[in-house]
Amino acid sequence: MASSSSPERGLEALRDTDESEGEAPGPSGPRGRGGPSGAGSALRLRSLEAEMAAACVTSTAGEDLGTFSEPGSQHGDPEGGGGPDLELGHARPMMRSQRELGLTPKGGGKADQGGKGRKGGSGSPPHTKSSRKREQPNPNRSLMAQGAAGPPLPGARGSPAMPQPESSLSPRPDQSHHFDFPVGNLEAPGPTLRSSTSQGSGSTPVPEALRCAESSRAESDQSSPAGRELRQQASPRAPDDDDDGDGGPDPRGSGTPEGWVLRSGVVPFGRRSSASEVSPEEVRPEAQCTGWNLRPRPRSSASAVSPEARPKAQSAGRNLRPRPRSSASVVSPEARPKAQSAGRNLRPRPRSSASVVSPEARPEAQSAGRNLRPRATPRVPVAPSSTTRSSSDRGSSRAPRSRSRSRSCSTPRLGSDHQRSRKIKMRLDLQVDREPESEAEQEEQELESEPGPSSRPQASRSSSRFAVPGRSSLAAEDSPPRRPVRMRASSPSPPGRLYPLPKHYFEGVHSPSSSSSESSSVSSSHSPLNKAPDPGSSPPLSSLSGPNPFWLALIADLDNLDSSSPRVPGEEIEAAPHTREEEDKKCRG
């Protein structure tokens, strides 16, 4: 306390000098600043002026004055120990109070300059005096806001780790009573800001402080367009505060030309505009530009992103995603309609890692998810779809999917395709032997009974010709429930298997469906070689020697499948052995 009090007294003397100079913002700013450069301090003074104009806009809203001494106090922390936090926290409530007092831009500018003087390295007393002179309507509030903001700043300078309220109170009993008001005024963001800034030296707790301050500000400012303007202007201020309060040491390293660019950009708005002229739109483009410039400073840039900036911030602010918390927390109630409509994109960004699927994102995620789900789920059905590709129903419905998938999954299906091709050959031989339906049904049922493409190649190779009768008979026993499968097989060629088959089969591909023909055409070059060593002598013969004349004849038979009538499972079972033999004969011959 004592350690902070002596520097505070020195700062008070500086404040007196700076107060007189505060009305000449240029000299007071550079002198009081002792910042990186006179130009930087001049920019800060301009930013303070812009903030004053913003506060004047808020004064049009007619809320309390307390906010006002804050901009100065915000920037008043050259060492930035807790400056930005205090600035942000106090800036908004004090802007409210200033609105209540209805300060004129002129008075606001003077008070701001007083704040500049104080910022210039002096505490709030000169600002207190200037505020008393200019803001007579509510000197207590100005004092209280200054007492809340100004003294803690010297405290932050002298002993940043010290609880700043007490340090400021001890050197300045005259303003100590004002701390009660700022506590009430600041609605807990003030004290929390002080404690957080004093403890964390203003670096980490700032987002939380911003949230508290913005929540309180949002509560007070929700109804008023000036509230929005304050939000945007205070949010640009937040960057300014970061640079101004932190300007010297700037724990965040935010004392960068970016911040000053921000200030110079904000300044034109403040100077150009009378109190009401500073429209949210004007400041928002500014905030957008500043937000982009301020990306290195996530909280300030995200806070700078105003409701209107946020839609753009969403499109462009996907850059802001790294700043989820601030963008989410900064979304004030007014901003939330916009932020909800567009900001649902923002909110998933805060939650993005956990619950990116926001209401709006969900349609996209659902549409994309539907894309994913068809990809995912049909990949599961890939086995049945590929198995039943010979069926027209599933073949027609799944053919497009399975085609795309078969391209990707063609490698596991190659075996299944060749197995299918053999079975098609079987079917065609059976159809040549008056039993097209029975064996086709058996084949399909066998394919369906087989668990998946991976097992299918194995089954086709291991039991390619010899297990077929048994399997076909078993599947044929199941055929009555599988009659739908037979129906699918009964009319495959037009819908299910759109036979570009001659090309593909002449290429050596033996896929029953166009999709499988595509996937197998991918592998057509290797397929004869890969499948040649299959256990049955017929597969290599059929794949290497047989395909062209064999499939020419059998494709016509496949086309005849539509007209062919389904067979009884008993016939199918009977048909299986000799048809297999005939198939082997034909494939070999």
Swiss-Prot record:
Q: Please state where this protein is localized.
A: Nucleus; Cytoplasm
This protein's UniProt keywords: Cytoplasm, Nucleus, Phosphoprotein
InterPro entries cross-referenced by the UniProt entry: EZH_Inhibitor
Phenotype when the gene is knocked out: No overt developmental defects with mutant adults appearing indistinguishable from wild-type. Two-fold increase in H3K27me2 and H3K27me3 levels in germ cells in testis but males display normal testis-to-body weight ratio and normal fertility. Increased H3K27me3 levels in postnatal oocytes and slight increase in the number of oocytes with lagging chromosomes. No significant differences in the number of primordial, primary and secondary/antral follicles of pre-pubertal females but older females show a reduced number of follicles at 16 weeks.
Residue spans of biased composition, Gly residues class: 29-38, 105-114
Give the top-rank taxon of the lineage listed in the UniProt record for this protein.
Answer: Eukaryota
The terms under GO molecular function for this entry are:
protein-containing complex binding
Gene Ontology terms: biological process: chromatin organization; oocyte development
Using the UniProt annotation, give all residue ranges assigned to the region (Sufficient for interaction with EZH2). Answer: 482-490
Its cellular-component GO annotations read: cytoplasm; nucleus
**Signal peptide (UniProt feature, chain positions):** none
Q: Where is this region: Disordered?
A: 1-46, 61-548, 561-589
Q: In which tissues is it expressed?
A: Highly expressed in ovary with lower expression in testis and very low levels in other tissues tested including prostate, brain, kidney, spleen and liver. During spermatogenesis, expressed mainly in spermatogonia with very low expression in spermatocytes I and II.
Q: Does the keyword tRNA processing apply?
A: no
Q: Where is the composition biased (Basic and acidic residues)?
A: 426-437, 575-589
Q: Which residues carry this modification: Phosphoserine?
A: S306
This chain belongs to the protein called: EZH inhibitory protein
Q: What is the organism of origin for this protein?
A: Mus musculus
The encoding gene is Ezhip
